[in-house]
Amino acid sequence: MIQGGDPNGDGTGGAEDTIKGEFSSNGVKNDISHVRGTISMARSTDPDSASSQFFIVQSDSTHLDGDYAAFGHVTSGMDIVDQICKDAKPTDGNGTIAKDQQPVIESIRMVD
């Protein structure tokens, strides 16, 4: 998987305001499964701690269903996600990429 949305670029950042975790183990029905291409909210161990960080599932990870708030799907460009994951050179066990090598989302489009 690939994770983004951290303003600090080190996996620790986020907005001051957080949102309720919208997944079944937190009392909210969410039928979106964590299959390849799913976009979901990242969070800490607190189920209501999501803010700006998100992740894109590169390969089916249905073990996350019910515990993370999936909210969308990549409609095109999974080849780019695959290439980023392939080229990544993590600096630690958490998959952190050096700041000068982190990919940047330059544009995004939401589709209904």
Model regions and ranges:
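Cyclophilin-like peptidyl-prolyl cis-trans isomerases
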Residues: 1-112
